[in-house]
Amino acid sequence: MMAVLGNAKHPEYGSATVPLPIPNDEYGHVMELLGTLGIGDVMERDCKVEEIRGGLPILKRLEKVAVNIDELDYLAKRLDSFDYIEAAQFQAMAVKTGIFDMKGLINLTFCCQQATVITDFSDLEAIGRHHLVSINGGCLSSELADTDLRMTALKLILSKDGTVTPYGVVYDNGLKLEAVYDGRHLPGYHYEQDMLAVGISSQTDSENSSKITWLYLPCSQAQVERGMMRSGISDPEEKETFDDVKARRIALELAQARLESCGAGEYETQRGAV
């Protein structure tokens, strides 16, 4: 997926075409490119989406809207991992709930799987199976075998609780949108395999604070610095600990390599306060 981004206040600056998700090794370059256009702030939604190329059709609603680049990148990563069922659930629920803002769309990625979306009414057993999996968060094969899936589907369809959308008839099943993303601290999420995660927070926050910004190692200096700013780390003394972050990154990478050589699998640091 590609996004064409510009500066709404200064359209004469031109635009930049950004790949989404942003490849790790291109992150710093992308931020520099956006900086030449006077956009790409850590927190501000200052990137006007001129065009979305590829990706889910629902994302076209972001065109002509101002977004934050890191939020857009995070949303793209979340959606990139969706299968076709989750894609239908996300898009149908976005239409049903009328969600347009980036915070809402990100939060929707964490709960849209609870909805049931019917795109083909010809296979009642498949509908019944999908509905049971959606409302239960999964089902054992034995449970599915003991259930009349056709009757389950018919009850759902005859309930008339569905909402017709361009992506199918959606049943929300009582889904409630929760604020997993608070608008500042992007929730931890392993987009790629074999990554290390380090949570950073300001020294002024309590030990059990939920105000954590996650860094996925190895990452660029730009990602670390922007992560620190997103986490609210602005005190000069705290910024000096940037060297400690780099040292921790090296230590964690060595630990990962050691564990992999022993076949121990993935290693993750749950939280590290800066």
Regions found by a protein language model. Name each.
Residues 1-26, 190-221:
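Short, extreme N-terminal segment that most often corresponds to the first beta-strand
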Residues 28-147, 151, 171-195, 207-274:
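Mixed-charge (acidic/basic) macromolecular-recognition segments
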Residues 150-158:
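Elongated, non-catalytic scaffold/linker segments and compositionally distinctive motifs
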Residues 164:
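Short, surface-exposed polybasic-aromatic patches that bind anionic ligands, especially phosphate groups
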